[in-house]
Amino acid sequence: MFSKKITALALVSAVKAHGTVSGIVADGIYYDGYNPSYQYTSPAPVTVGWLIPKDLDNGFISPAAYTTSDIICHVDAAPAQIEAPVKAGGKVELQWTPWPVSHKGPVIDYLANCNGPCETVDKTKLQWFKIDQVGLISPTAETSGLWGTDVLIANNNSWTVTIPSDIATGNYVLRHEIIALHSASSVNGAQNYPQCVNLAIKGTGTAKPAGVSATSFYTPTDPGIQFSLYGTLTSYTIPGPALYSGAISVTQTLPAAPTASATGVYTVS
């Protein structure tokens, strides 16, 4: 039974796979991301990435589901049971499975304070503030333009985000997302790939930015959601709330080798 389940999973993934975060590097320490195949192992690995066992095809959330809880951290996502420690002002690298070149679009990052343990947080109560966004970089650099996803691919399918240095110590969820626009010219054609990671952030800051619910981020007809990737491009409006004033931009470069690996930590006090 075990081998049959794994074989079925492999076949589905081969046909429909797009991408998922397979690894996280927080302040130079590597952590495994979640893989849906873990549900077929005993004991299942404990990861800092949120659990998405129903995402068997590494699939997406469509605009039709923007008002449902699936847009928060992916389909039927459940909180990770450990957290990766990172300093305020530190860097978190998200390592994706190989991303398709044709799936161009923005890369966006949000944070939400769990106001307690993230392991037991009600995801529908999380209030998110945007800390990073890269959309259309150059409309004429290549066919369909140069996008955040192209930079991600060029950086070994990885993306680095800096944690704002002014935020208060606490337990947070990092929501990292790619929005693929290759079919977005029609309503419900955009493809959202949200991935969530538990972080234990420590610093000297006191800021507690206001946020919004993920179910209010986007609508199916937002100009950055229903968008034609093909033809003459002039501009692109990145969807979602405004960027947090304390956000720190990152110049994406080829990632450095992790200094160590770990399985995660439990909640910081």
Swiss-Prot record:
GO CC annotation, single: extracellular region
UniProt GO BP: cellulose catabolic process
Compartments (UniProt record): Secreted
Cofactor binding note of this UniProt entry: Binds 1 copper ion per subunit.
Glycan attachment sites: N156
InterPro entries: AA9, AA9_LPMO
Cleavable signal peptide: 1-17
Annotated Cu(2+) binding sites: H18, H103, Y193
EC number: 1.14.99.56
Disulfide bond sites: C73-C196
Reactions mediated catalytically: [(1->4)-beta-D-glucosyl]n+m + reduced acceptor + O2 = 4-dehydro-beta-D-glucosyl-[(1->4)-beta-D-glucosyl]n-1 + [(1->4)-beta-D-glucosyl]m + acceptor + H2O
Gene Ontology terms for molecular function: metal ion binding; monooxygenase activity
Cofactor(s), names only, from the UniProt record: Cu(2+)
Upregulating conditions: Expression is not induced in cellulose-inducible conditions (in Avicel- and wheat bran-containing complex medium).
Biotech uses: Lignocellulose is the most abundant polymeric composite on Earth and is a recalcitrant but promising renewable substrate for industrial biotechnology applications. Together with cellobiose dehydrogenases (CDHs) an enzymatic system capable of oxidative cellulose cleavage is formed, which increases the efficiency of cellulases and put LPMOs at focus of biofuel research.
Sequence positions that bind O2: H182, Q191
Keywords of this entry: Carbohydrate metabolism, Cellulose degradation, Copper, Disulfide bond, Glycoprotein, Metal-binding, Monooxygenase, Oxidoreductase, Polysaccharide degradation, Secreted, Signal
Family listed: Belongs to the polysaccharide monooxygenase AA9 family.
Stated role: Lytic polysaccharide monooxygenase (LPMO) that depolymerizes crystalline and amorphous polysaccharides via the oxidation of scissile alpha- or beta-(1-4)-glycosidic bonds, yielding C1 and C4 oxidation products. Catalysis by LPMOs requires the reduction of the active-site copper from Cu(II) to Cu(I) by a reducing agent and H(2)O(2) or O(2) as a cosubstrate.
Matching PANTHER family: ENDO-BETA-1,4-GLUCANASE D, PUTATIVE (AFU_ORTHOLOGUE AFUA_1G12560)-RELATED
Official protein name in the record: AA9 family lytic polysaccharide monooxygenase I
Organism: Botryotinia fuckeliana (strain B05.10)
Gene: AA9I
